[in-house]
Amino acid sequence: MTSFVKSKADELATTAADHAALIKGAVDALNTVAPPALTISAQDGRRDADLAEDGWTDEEAAFVGRNLRAAGLSEDQIQRLLNGEKLTDVPVGVQEYLHMFYGNLDSDELFSLKSKFDGMETPDGASWSRALGQGLVTLSNENVGNNAGYQYLPSWVRDWSENYNSNDGKRIRDIDVPLAGLIGNSGSAPPGERFGTELIRKAAGGASRSAEDSGLLAPESNYGNLHDVPDAARSKYEETIRRFLDVGGRSQVAATAFLTGEYADGTALVDFDRDDMVGYAFRHDWNDGGAAAGSLVDWIRDYGGSGNPTNVALADRAFSGLFDCTTSTGGDNTFSDLMNANSSGDAIGKINPHLAGALREASLPYLNILVGGDSAVYGHSGFDPDIPPDEMQRRTARLFTLIASDNTYGEPTAENPDGTGAGADLYRDILDQTVRNGATAGELAASEPHRARSLAELSANLRALGQSGLYGAEYDLQRDEDANTDERNDANTKVRNIVSSASAGLTAVPHPAAIGVGAAGTAAAPWLLPAESPGDVPFRPPTVAGGGGTAAEDEMHLVYGALRGLETTPEPGTLAEYWYREDGQLKPLAHILSEHKGDSGELLSAMERALGDDDLLESLRAGTSTGNHQGRMNFDPTDPDNYDDMILNGSD
C-alpha cells in the first residue's frame, strides 16, 4: 500500500513538473513573441508621468527607467533613421507611450528624473539616463511611425524652441543647460527636421555671444567686472551650445534647412537670417576644433556620391545653400566675415580646422561642376547656381580659399596629427579628379571624342582655381600677420614680394625661382618654391601629400587617366613598358613618378605618345590650354590688390 501511494505521489510530482515546464515555456515564448515594447501603451506613459507628482522614489525611478529602456530604438532602427529612412516597425504603443510620458511632465520633473538616474552611479542608472534622453529625441522625429514629430513634443519644449532670444539668462540657466545635458546623452539617435533645426539655431545663436554676455550666470554674480566669468561657467556655456549643435547636426534634413533657410516642404524658417546664423556657427572658436560645426556639412560627400536619388537631391540642396552663403561678397559680405572671423582677422579654417576639412569633404562630389561642368551630366541637377560664369569662377576660388585657410603647413597639430592640411588635401583631390576625368576621356575616345576637350578644360581650370585657393589663404594669413605688427608701412611691399614669389607656380610664365625646380619652360607648383624669395620674404604654402610638383606633373594626371581609360598595351622596348604591372594594369602614378629618373616633361611626352591617338591628344592639349586660361582670367596672383578687389570684396 505504501509503495502504491508513493508511486502515485511520484506520478503527480512528475505531472506537476511537466506542467510547470510547459507554463514556463509558454511565458518565455510570450516574451519572445511579445517583448516589453509591444505591451507598452499610452496609459502606461500617463501613469509613469504621474509618479513625478511627489518626487521620484528609487523604486519609481527604476520602474520608469525600465519602461523607457523597453521603449528605446534598436541600433538598427537608429542607423536607418540616420540614413533618412521612415521607420514602420516601431510599435504604436511605444510612440503613444513616449508622447504621453513626456507630454505630462514639466521641465523640472523631467530634469529631476535625469538627476535621479545619474545620481544612482550604477550601470542601470546610466542606461536609464540615456534612454530618457533618447526618448525625447525619438519623439521629435517625424520618421518614427505616424505619432511622432515636432508637434508631439511637450508644449514647454516647443515654447523653448521658438524663443530666439540668445540673451535670456534665466532660460539658459533653467532650460538650456539641463536640456543639453539630457539630449546630449541620447546615443546617436537623430532628431526630426524641425526640432533638429531649432537645436542648431540655438547653438548658432549661443555662438554669436560669449558666456560673459549670455546671462548664464545668476544675476547676483554679474556685479563687478562682467568679464570675470568663472572658468566652470564658461566651460558649461560652451558645452551647452556644442551639444545642441552636435544633436541637431545628426539630422541631415535639419542641417539642410539651416544651410538653406527652408524646410524640405519649401516653408521658410521664421525670423531667420541664414547668412548671419551660418556665420555665427562657423566663426565661433569651438573647443572641439570645429568638429560639431563640420558635422553640418561633412555628410554631403557621402550623400552626394551615394547614387540614391533622394540622398543626392538632399545633398544638392544643402551644398547649394552652403556654396551661396560662404562665397557671397554681396550685402554684408559673408565671405569676408569668414576670412576675418575674429578681432585678429583669423579665418575660420585657422580657428576651426575640422570645419575646413568638412568643407573640403562637402565639395568633392561637385568639383567638375564648380568649374563649369554641366550639373545634369555629372548627376547633380539640384546644384545648378544661377550665376554668370566669371562670378562662378571667383566664387569657387573663394570656397577653395576657405578650405585652405586651416593654416597647418603640413605640420602635425593636436586636431590634425597626420600634418596634412585641408588645402593640401583638396589639391590632392583635384589631381585625383583630374585622373578620373582623363580616364573618362579615354573611355569615351571612340564614342564621344568631343568630351575629351571639355574634360581636359575642366581639369586644368580646376587645378588653377585650386592653386588660387591655396594662394588666397596664404595671402590672407600673411596680411593678417602684418596687420598685427608695427611695420604697417612695410606691409604692402612685403605682400607684393610674397605675391611675386608665389606667382611662379600660379602662372604660365616661369619665374626665376622656378627654373631648375621644374621642367624647362614650366612653372613649379607653389609649395615647391624655395623659402627664399624676392626681398627675402618667406612664403610658407602647404605641402601636397602625394600631389604634383611641376606643372608637367599636374598635367600628367590627365594623360595618365586617359591611358587608364584606353586600356592600351605598351609597345615592347619603350619607356611605357615600365609603367605596367605583370597583370597588365597600370601602376599607380606615384610609383611611376618615383621610378622615373629623368625630366618630368620627358615623362609627360612619353605618356602622350603612348596614347597612340592623335585626335585625343590634340583635344586634351586644347582643353588644357583653355582651362588654364579660364582659371587665371578672373584671378591674377601677380596683383596683390586682386585678392582684395575680386576675391575678398567681389568684382566691381
How would you label these PLM feature ranges?
Residues M1-D228, Y237-I241, Q252, G565-D652:
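Intrinsically disordered, low-complexity charged segments of secreted bacterial virulence
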Residues G249-V253, T507:
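Sec-exported extracytoplasmic/periplasmic mature domains
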Residues A254-H284:
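Short linear, low-complexity motifs centered on an aromatic residue
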Residues V94, H99, K114, N147-G149, ...:
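Generic intrinsically disordered, low-complexity segments enriched for polar/acidic and small residues
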Residues D213, F258-E262, G373:
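General "foldedness" signal
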Residues Y102, G249, L259, F282, ...:
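Ankyrin-repeat helical core positions
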Residues D288-D652:
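Long, contiguous all-alpha helical interaction modules
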Residues D89-V92, E96, D108, P123, ...:
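Residues within HEAT/ARM-like alpha-solenoid scaffolds
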